[in-house]
Structure formats: C-alpha cells, structure tokens
C-alpha cells in the first residue's frame, strides 16, 4: 500500500472510531432535568426524554390528567412535613402512568444516582435508604367508612382546611386513572402527627381506576395502603417496607389478586387489615398471596386482621417466618382458605399458628403444595428482582 492510500485508510478508521464514540457518548448522555412544584391544573404529559424532579408537593387539580410516558424517570427532593415532596392526585383528577416491562416508570429520590430507568441496578441507594420523600397519594370519590360517619374525610398530613385534600363519596365506579408497570422507591417521609407516608396511598379510589404491576421498594411506612374505596388491583410487589407490606383500612371493598411481599428486618406484618369504622364494614377479597422474610424476626407477623374486618383471603403461601410469627385473626367474618405456612422450613398445619381464630375454625383451611399464579417471573421488570439476583 502506498503512503497516500495508507493515510486515507487510517483517516477512515479514525473517522469510524470517532463516529462510534460519538454514538456511545450520545447514548449515555444524561436527560435534562425539569423541576416540578405546585399545582398541575390542565392536562399535562411527562416524557421519557426528561428527568422530572418533584420539589415539595406536586398536586394534580381541577379534573386535570397527568400522563407519564413509559420509561420516564421521576425524582423527588428530600424533606419532611410540611415540605415533603410527593405526587398528589386530587379527587376528580387522574393519573395515566402506563409503563411496560421493558420501560417501566420509576419514582425515586433525588439522592438516587441513576440517570435513566435502565440504570436501576446501578443505584448506590439500598433498602436502608427509606423515608426520603412522600410517595404517591390518590384521592378518589368512592365509599369509605370512617369514625366521623362522614362520606368524606381528609388525608392525614394534609391541610384539613383545603377541601381538595378530602376523599371519599358515593361513586363506586369513580375513575382516578391508570397505573401500570410503576416502581416507587425509597419513600415514607415523616408527615406529622407521628406518621410516615406510604409508597402508594389509595384513598377512596373507585373501581374504574386500574392498578396493576406496581412495585414499592424500601418504603419507611406501609408499601401500599387502601383507605376504603372499591378499586381493584393486581400484581403488587412490596420489598422491605418499614411497617406493613399491604394495609387495608376504612372499609376497603375491592379485589386484589397476586400479591408478593418480602419483609425486611424493620418490617412489621405482611398484611394488615382494619375494617370500617363508620356505617359499613366493607367486603374485600385477596387471592394468590405470597409472603416471605429475608431475615426472620420475632417482631414480624404474617397477617393482622382486626375484629371489624369482613372479607376473604385465599391461596396464601407464607414462608421463612420465625417460630414466634403468627396470623392474628380477630374477626369471625374473614375466611382464610388454602393457607400454607412454613417456619424455618417446617410445614405448619395447625390453628395454634393463628391467634384468636380457633372459634372461627370453620373459616380456616390449610393446604400443602400450593401453586401460586404470581410466579416471580412476572416481576422480572422490577428493581427487587434485579437486586436479589445479584
């Protein structure tokens, strides 16, 4: 090869290398940040080519709809009540957050180093980084059952003088939008009056709302709490919550299918259920429930069900709990069917594992070799799956 041809070849190679490097750099470029604060009063879309930063409370009001594209990353600045960062959907407004297994929608803390949803497994935060922001709260107009016997009430931690902070009503089919393939991480900040926020809080939400494929990772309080309402939900995964995995209260009357709760060292119960406190009790249904523990502790309970609860729980597989862990059943109106409990890998088939339930034994059945529909493969998109597979 003569000198000129050699130089042209080298130049071409360098050009190719430079072009390839440029493509790589462009692919890794951090998306621009958009700070969000205050109220959203008209239909708005958050796109995947931005990182949205919630700075204190962001609320959707006046019947507006917030649409969030698949693969969008939302971060929230740290802070406690009254400066806690959170996303609040008020009654009559909607959230349309529909991700995919390949492009989930991720809510996390601004302390999280990730700059793209695809970098989730590179986060420097872990399950001990709880309580960094306020989570997501949805206020709907479906029936609730509260102490004041009113059809509506305000969410604790919000200003009771502001009527947009109220939830509940008579609309069983109330529609607050859609949430699907959404991961909510490191929430549960202090909200005043001795309480912390949940990862996802559903207050009086109606059954036209769609809740499916939701992950709550390392929240300081409950993972997901239902305050009354009639909303149905499916494919819920809660990992290492500071309190309960799933909590039902105020006469929740919906159906939840496919639940997986992985308790951490600070967790309390896999599931806690409190009945209605007002004119009606509600009537819930839970099915295909998998509860397990990373490190067994005497303080962890499998389930707590109070005396005012009414509903059914079927096909429950609880594993790896300590010998001191029990199901606390105080209600004669809750049926527990197809329970399989193992403690320290020992199969349990005895009512002695259920406190307060002996007089209600007709509502309790044990099974073995249960097969659950909520196989862990369905959660391959989650941060939980990525972290436990390391």
Cite the ranges covered by each PLM segment.
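Extracellular beta-rich repeat passengers
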Residues: 31-66, 77-92, 100, 104, ...
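Catalytic metal-binding/acid-base residues of hydrolase active sites
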Residues: 73
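Bacterial Sec-dependent N-terminal signal peptides
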Residues: 2-5, 18-38
């Amino acid at each position: 090869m003569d000198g000129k041809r050699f130089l042209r070849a080298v130049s071409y190679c360098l050009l190719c290398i430079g072009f390839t490097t440029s493509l790589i750099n462009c692919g890794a470029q951090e998306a621009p940040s958009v700070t969000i604060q205050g109220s959203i009063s008209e239909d708005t879309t958050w796109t995947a080519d931005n990182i949205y930063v919630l700075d204190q409370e962001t609320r959707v009001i006046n019947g507006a709809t917030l649409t969030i594209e698949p693969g969008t990353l939302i971060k929230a600045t740290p802070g406690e009540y009254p400066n806690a960062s959170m996303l609040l959907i008020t009654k009559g407004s909607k959230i349309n957050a529909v991700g995919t297994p390949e492009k989930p929608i991720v809510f996390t803390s601004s302390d999280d180093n990730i700059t793209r949803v695809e970098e989730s497994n590179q986060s420097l935060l872990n399950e001990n980084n709880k309580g960094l922001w306020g989570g997501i709260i949805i206020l709907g107009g479906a029936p609730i059952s509260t102490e004041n016997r009113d059809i509506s009430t305000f969410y604790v931690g919000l200003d009771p003088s502001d009527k947009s902070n109220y939830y509940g009503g008579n609309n069983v089919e109330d529609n607050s939008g859609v949430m699907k393939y959404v991961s909510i991480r490191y929430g549960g900040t202090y909200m005043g009056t001795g309480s912390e926020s949940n990862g996802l809080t559903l207050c009086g939400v109606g059954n036209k709302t769609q809740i499916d494929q939701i992950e709550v990772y390392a929240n300081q309080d409950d993972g997901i709490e239902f305050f009354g309402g009639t909303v149905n939900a499916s494919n819920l995964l809660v990992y290492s919550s500071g309190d309960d995995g799933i909590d039902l209260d105020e006469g929740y009357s919906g159906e939840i299918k496919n639940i997986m709760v992985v308790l951490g060292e600070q967790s309390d119960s896999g599931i806690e259920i409190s009945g209605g406190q007002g004119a009606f009790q509600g009537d819930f249904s839970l099915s295909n429930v998998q509860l397990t523990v990373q490190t067994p502790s005497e303080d962890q309970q499998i389930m707590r069900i109070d005396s005012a609860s009414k509903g059914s729980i079927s096909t429950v597989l609880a594993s790896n709990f300590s010998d001191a862990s029990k199901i606390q059943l105080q209600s004669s109106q809750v049926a527990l069917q197809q329970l399989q409990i193992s403690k320290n890998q020992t199969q349990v088939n005895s009512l002695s594992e259920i406190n307060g339930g002996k007089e209600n034994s007709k509502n309790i059945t044990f099974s073995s070799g249960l097969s659950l529909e909520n196989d862990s493969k369905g959660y391959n998109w989650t941060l939980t799956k990525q972290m436990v597979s390391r």
